[in-house]
């Protein structure tokens, strides 16, 4: 009924927001790693 529809929507929203947060974290790690690699290549310290 109404509750199961609402429950599904809420679970879906939680999953989506969770995935977005994970994506941000992973994205930041990738960016940081990329900057580190670029920095050591510029300095010639890789």
Curated annotation (Swiss-Prot):
InterPro entries assigned to the protein according to its UniProt record, in alphabetical order: Antimicrobial_frog_2
A Gene Ontology biological process term: defense response to Gram-negative bacterium
Swiss-Prot/TrEMBL keywords: Amphibian defense peptide, Antibiotic, Antimicrobial, Disulfide bond, Secreted
This protein's GO CC annotations: extracellular region
Domain of life: Eukaryota
Tissue distribution of the protein: Expressed by the skin glands.
Compartmental location: Secreted
Disulfide pattern: 40-46
Coiled-coil blocks: none
Family stated for the protein in its record: Belongs to the frog skin active peptide (FSAP) family. Esculentin subfamily.
Function: Antimicrobial peptide. Stimulates insulin release by BRIN-BD11 cells in vitro.
Protein name as annotated: Esculentin-1
Source organism of the structure: Pelophylax saharicus
């Amino acid at each position: 009924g109404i509750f199961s529809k609402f429950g599904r929507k809420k679970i879906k929203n939680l999953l989506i927001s969770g995935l977005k947060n994970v994506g941000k974290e992973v994205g930041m790690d990738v960016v940081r790693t990329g900057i580190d690699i670029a920095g050591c290549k510029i300095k010639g310290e890789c």
